Amino acid sequence: MPKDYDRSYFDRWYRDPARRVASRAALRRKAAMAVAVAEHFLGRRVRTVLDVGCGEAAWRAPIRALRPDVSYLGLDSSAYAVRRFGRSRNVRAGSFHELAALRFERPFDLVVCADVLHYVPAPELSRGLTGLAALCGGVAYLEVMTREDDPEGDLRGFLKRPAAWYRHRFSTAGFAACGSHLYLSPTLAARSTTLERAPR
């Protein structure tokens, strides 16, 4: 039976102090790190952000607090999130595997995909990564828990895959790891120095 990403789901895992796995302060720090790394490698301010599997668009506020003029687009499969936040937070309907077919006017400076990929089946993940690499012109924040970790929170549908499995797929798509769940786009990876990139 598929999960229903309705309001009660987000209440349980993102707002309930007894169950949520990350605080707002932690999210602000992640956003600041992702923006800073993207701007370092781009050599300019972040202008565009794509948030894949954005849910209620929790990343939007901390990013806009840093860069008020940023253009933010969220994609999520939750009908509730799209209905409630579509206009106010620019959240549109979309699933990870659909990224292979999506194209926009230009690539995004920062792509966020947090707490999503460890629920995505392998065939869909492989298809989506190809599209994600094409949509990312700067840096991607791909937060994933692996078999080697001890994840908390929603474990229903969690796929216990080894870190090496993800590293191989990210690398095959053209991403280069640069630490702390951050990956350089294929374009930036080609311009980076050896020690800026994590070993494959």
Where are these regions (language model features)?
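A conserved beta-strand element that flanks and buttresses the S-adenosyl-L-methionine
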Residues: 112
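Short catalytic micro-motifs in class I SAM-dependent methyltransferases
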Residues: 115-116
